[in-house]
Amino acid sequence: VTVTISPAELADLPAIAALLEEMDRFYGTTDFEPPADRVTQIQAHLFRDHPTAFVLLARADHQVVGLASYSFLWPAVGLTQSLYLKELYVVASHRRQSIGQALMQRLHAVAAETGCSRVEWTADAGNAGAQRFYAELGYKVADKLFYRVEGEDLNR
């Protein structure tokens, strides 16, 4: 199987929407907006003058089988920027085929090309598969805590 990694394009919107829905189902989401709304939201974030985020897509035999979504954060070490990986997902049928590793390697290249001093991300504490994947690639757990405010708490 030949795998290619490339930046998402406008024509990829339906595939991105389907992949994100599959990922959300993997994490237990059961309530979804209509597909057309999802495509509109994705387009609004990825394909505007100053995108909120960027997506790399993995394709196997011309079929989208994985994605990495990321943004840039500033400041990082020495007033550089960091690349923040928000989501890394590979469809179940294509896991354990080095696709996730290929996406991570491409992220490393993007970070280097854009002057980032590091790549950072989180993994769910209960996602043993993700933790095993990152450990197999030699990544170390950072000594950080992750905080979140959401929903109605944003109004206080």
Identify the residue ranges that each predicted region occupies.
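Conserved GNAT-fold acetyl-CoA-binding loop/helix
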Residues: A17, E21-A44
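Conserved active-site alpha-helix within GNAT-family acetyltransferase domains
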Residues: Q101, E113, A125-D143, V149
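Conserved beta-strand in the GNAT
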Residues: L57, Q63-F72, Y89
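Conserved acetyl-CoA-binding loop-helix of GNAT-fold acetyltransferases
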Residues: V90, R96-A109, R132, E136
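Conserved GNAT acetyl-CoA-binding A-motif
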Residues: A112-T122
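A conserved beta-turn-beta hairpin within the catalytic core of GNAT-like acetyltransferases
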Residues: L73-L85, R95, A142
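A short beta-loop-alpha structural element at the N-terminal edge
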Residues: T4-A18
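A short helix-loop-beta-strand connector motif used in the catalytic cores of GNAT acetyltransferases and
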Residues: H45-L56, Y84
